[in-house]
Regions:
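Membrane-interface alpha helices of multi-pass inner-membrane proteins
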Residues: 187-191, 212, 225-240, 274-284, ...
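Short hydrophobic alpha-helices at membrane interfaces in multi-pass membrane enzymes
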Residues: 216-233, 263-276, 322-326, 428-435
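C-terminal luminal/periplasmic domains and tails of membrane-associated envelope-modifying transferases
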Residues: 3-6, 516-563, 573-584, 590-853
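Specific aromatic-rich, kink-prone transmembrane helix
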Residues: 61, 165, 190, 202-220, ...
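Transmembrane-helix signature of polytopic, membrane-embedded enzymes
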Residues: 166-189
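Membrane-interface transmembrane helices that cradle and orient dolichyl/undecaprenyl
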Residues: 210-225, 255-265, 301-304, 390-396, ...
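Juxtamembrane membrane-water interface segments that cap and precede transmembrane helices
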Residues: 104-107, 121-132, 139-143, 346-384
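Transmembrane-helix motifs of polytopic, lipid-linked glycan transferases
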Residues: 153-173
């Protein structure tokens, strides 16, 4: 009897134990799944940070950072002869509106200069200081190397912070951890092609931080809103994108204000603000795809605010008051705690909505997202996100409203229905902020990263609420119980295992690819091989040209490519007292921050050869002919006149501008023809070149003549023996008379090639030396020997840095030998060298494919 009682008493214990075991299994699986989620987000963040983006702005940043560290933050621009001058001056004030002149009279010019300075307004000054401070001086002291990867680590760090903020924003919106992690990964993937090492990276991160603060304010405690004060103070000093916070605070405050009013006042206030604003937008921009989307958004918000007001999330009147106060405090703080004070604010509007703002935005990154011919970044993931978000919103709205209405009617009729699930409230402010950020990205693709950051948590919220509501509805129809069904353990286990396998697959794949691209041998350069060099394509920058400028103490004014300006400034030795660089730029990538529109258009006009070059190209294009030598002489004469007009005596151009364009681009690449014209002008001589840059000087100036003569008398200094032999080869082959001198030039070219087996010395040999009959046998033997040596050492060289240069040199040599064989009517050799060329071209294509990311 005792045994039977004991046995009966043990049965409930067994059931309880099973329940505990089952509960523990679910709990353990959840913990494992969270770890996998974090690993997935880190893997996708790592992948997002590996994209290669050219870094023109990065070098500008380091030049500016050095200036600010050494001389403080001011509006005196030190790098260019054509930049804004510090002010305002009394002459400038005379051109101001009457109300501005009245204020100046009342407070005094000194006060105006302090609180609204003009000149060089560097909104990114703190980022520039951070960039410069992160780099050890040993990395750039000599000027022809840059081994530091500190800025690469900075990039990884800010985007890890970003993905953490995006994840917790989604969690605060009620999204399941798995779904939240998936959309965090998608956010990083969407913005990947736009994530580079530049000040905008801070804005991308701070958008995520800002949205997390809004979510904390809404779902945790309204006092979190005060965090925007320190965030915006930091933000306004690292990047001009801080204005995003104030723009998005307007709908955040406005919509929460509407939700706290009664239905009547909500309808009145919304309609008297939203519709006039929509009319203003349409009158300015017209009916375009982005404005059409904005119109739809205004209508949807009107419906939600009027008919579904009780279902809206609200922070209450206390939250509204705190948000208004925090926004006001943040605004005042950004003016007080910024070295440019009010100008930091007004400058943002000048470059965004002023008369000439559109002119500055005619660059690739400012163009619309869905301009598929745009070479900057890719908008395909953004298009997927856009379609997914639109579909999710539409289905979410339909299903949520339909199921809630249907269940609402039945629960009123049947009071005994068990309710365990509450229909979610609608967070209009967060939804609107996500939608507006998408609108920004549709208009300008540079905003795609922040659109992904703002929208992905919202899209995840739509899907999460959609799935939960459908599950609750099905459960209600079947069991008359309003509750979300629990996913079976085996299904959860399958999803976790599938997720783990996916994370492992992508982690291993991208890890191996990272090793191959960033850690293994680098074919594009034999020396500039750090991760930073590869990721930013900075190996193309004028390292050795800048060293040449520094060693020969060049001063005055120069003409340069837009994208090279920042590096040239950083590569010089500034005046220790003023920070002014000796050789002043014509233009650089700081654009409207440092230059007037007229200066930019002047640079464009000269870079394009003016109206004369355009007319010459138009006529040649009409005839389908190449430009003649006479055409180039005319272009060169015009260039000479323009450069002298602005006291320019140095011109530095990337080799890309000197390379013959494809036939389809021949009549459009005006910069190529401009450089060709300059080369044919006898007053402008080449004094420095390599595989990446060419530097010309005006020999009618004493400085230019001294540099040119120094090639022959040894007084002009060069960074290394390769460059000195290369320029001597050019000088002797072009300008010295007699075959003995030409032979000497050929020998210089051979020495240069032995020091750096690359295209530049090879081209000097086959394009110039081969023109002289007595050198052709030497040239032919040299090319044959190199082809043989390349074949013997190819497998070894393929594992070394700079392999691409050797392949390209081999292609050029085989091309020359093919032409020699044609002249000799040696069909076998012609076919052999054609096969060699095809092999080299295939290898170049392969290297370009496997060493890009």
């Amino acid at each position: 009897m005792a045994k039977s009682v004991e046995g009966r008493n043990q049965k409930p214990d067994t059931g309880s134990q099973k329940l505990e075991v089952r509960s523990k299994m679910f709990s353990d699986l959840r913990r494992v799944s969270i770890v996998i989620c974090w690993l997935a987000m880190l893997v996708f963040t790592f992948h997002a940070c590996t994209h290669m983006v050219a870094a023109g702005d990065t070098w500008v940043a380091m030049a500016c950072g050095r200036h600010f560290v050494n001389h403080g933050v001011d509006t005196v621009e030190p790098f260019s002869a054509n930049s804004h001058k510090a002010g305002p001056t009394e002459e400038e004030i005379k051109t101001w509106p009457s109300w501005a002149r009245w204020i100046t009279d009342k407070v005094g010019l000194k006060t105006v200069k302090k609180w609204h300075p003009t000149g060089w307004i560097n909104q990114n000054w703190l980022t520039h200081v951070i960039f410069y401070s992160l780099i050890p001086k040993s990395s750039y002291a000599y000027g022809v190397s840059f081994p530091s990867n500190a800025l690469v680590y900075w990039k990884f760090a800010i985007y890890i912070v970003t993905v953490v903020c995006v994840y917790y924003t989604g969690r605060l919106l009620g999204v399941h951890p798995w779904l939240c992690a998936v959309f965090c990964c998608f956010a990083m993937f969407t913005g990947r092609s736009f994530l580079d090492i530049r000040p905008a990276g801070f804005s991308n991160m701070l958008v995520a931080v800002f949205l997390l603060i809004l979510a904390l304010t809404t779902y945790r405690n309204v006092l979190y809103i005060w965090l925007i004060v320190p965030v915006t103070v930091f933000w306004c000093n690292v990047h001009g994108g801080y204005i995003y916070a104030f723009i998005m605070l307007v709908p955040f405050i406005g919509l929460h204000l509407f939700t706290n009013c009664n239905k009547k006042w909500t309808a009145i206030l919304y309609n008297i603000t939203a519709w006039p604003f929509l009319f203003f937008v349409l009158s300015r921009a017209g009916l375009t795809f982005p404005t059409f989307l904005f119109s739809i958004l205004v209508i949807v918000l009107d419906i939600l605010l009027v008919f579904y007001k009780k279902n809206l999330v609200s922070i209450g009147w206390k939250g509204v008051y705190h948000t208004i106060a925090a926004a006001a405090a943040a605004f005042v703080a950004t003016v007080l705690f910024n070295p440019f004070h009010l100008t930091n604010l007004t400058h943002t509007f000048v470059i965004s909505v002023s008369e000439h703002a559109a002119r500055w935005r005619k660059i690739h990154e400012w163009l619309p997202a869905f301009d598929w011919t745009n070479p900057v970044g890719t908008a395909k993931p953004f298009l997927v996100m856009f379609i997914l978000g639109s579909a999710a919103f539409a289905v979410w709205a339909i299903v949520l409203l339909k199921t809630s209405t249907s269940i609402g009617r039945q629960t009123k009729r049947k009071k005994n229905i068990s309710e365990g699930y509450q229909w979610p409230k609608i967070d209009i402010p967060i939804i609107l902020i996500g939608a507006l950020t998408i609108y920004m990205a549709v208009r300008s693709r540079r905003f795609i990263p922040i659109a992904a950051i703002a929208a992905c948590p919202v899209i995840a919220m739509f899907i999460d609420q959609l799935v939960r509501s459908i599950s609750a509805f099905i459960n209600f129809r079947k069991n008359k119980r309003l509750a979300v069904g629990v996913m079976e353990y085996n299904l959860q286990l399958f999803i976790v295992l599938a997720g783990a396998m996916a994370v492992m697959y992508f982690g291993v794949w991208w890890g191996l690819k990272f090793k191959r691209i960033y850690l293994d041998s680098w074919p594009r350069d034999p020396k500039l091989t750090s991760m930073f060099m590869r990721m930013t394509d900075s190996g193309q920058k004028p390292f050795y040209a800048s060293r040449f400028i520094k060693d020969n103490e060049l001063e005055g004014k120069m003409f340069n490519s837009w994208t090279e300006g920042g590096f040239i400034a950083f590569g010089q030795e500034p005046d220790p007292n003023t920070g002014k660089t000796p050789l002043q730029l014509f233009m650089d990538g700081r654009a409207q921050a440092a230059y007037d529109r007229m200066a930019f258009e002047l640079w464009q006009d000269i870079m394009g050869g003016g109206a004369g070059t355009a007319e010459i190209l138009r006529r040649a294009g009409y005839r389908g002919e190449n430009l003649t030598n006479d055409d180039y002489v005319k272009i060169g004469q015009w260039m000479d006149e323009q450069l002298r007009k602005y006291n320019v005596w140095v011109v530095l151009m990337p080799q890309l501008k000197c390379s013959v364009p494809r036939r389809s681009e021949y009549y459009d690449k005006r910069s190529y023809h401009v450089v060709q014209g300059l080369e044919r002008n006898l007053d402008w001589r080449l004094v420095f070149f390599n595989n990446k840059q060419r530097l010309y000087v005006d020999i009618k100036t004493p400085e230019g003549k001294a540099l040119f003569d120094g090639i022959f008398n040894g007084e002009t200094l060069y960074p290394d023996d390769f460059h000195s032999n290369l320029i001597r080869a050019h000088g002797w082959l072009y300008y010295r008379m007699g075959i003995a001198e030409k032979k000497k030039g050929f020998d210089f070219a051979v020495k240069a090639f032995e020091l750096n087996e690359s295209p530049a010395p090879m081209l000097e040999i086959i394009l110039v030396a081969s023109k002289f009959a007595k050198l052709r046998a030497d040239v032919q033997k040299f090319c044959e020997d190199y082809i043989k040596r390349f074949t013997e050492n190819e497998s070894k060289w393929a594992k070394e840095d700079g392999f691409r240069n050797r392949v390209e040199a081999g292609r050029i040599a085989s091309y020359y030998l093919e032409n020699v064989a044609r002249i000799e009517n040696n069909t076998k050799l012609v076919n052999d060298y054609l096969a060699q060329q095809n092999k080299y071209v295939s290898e170049l294509i392969r290297l370009a494919r496997i060493k890009r990311w």
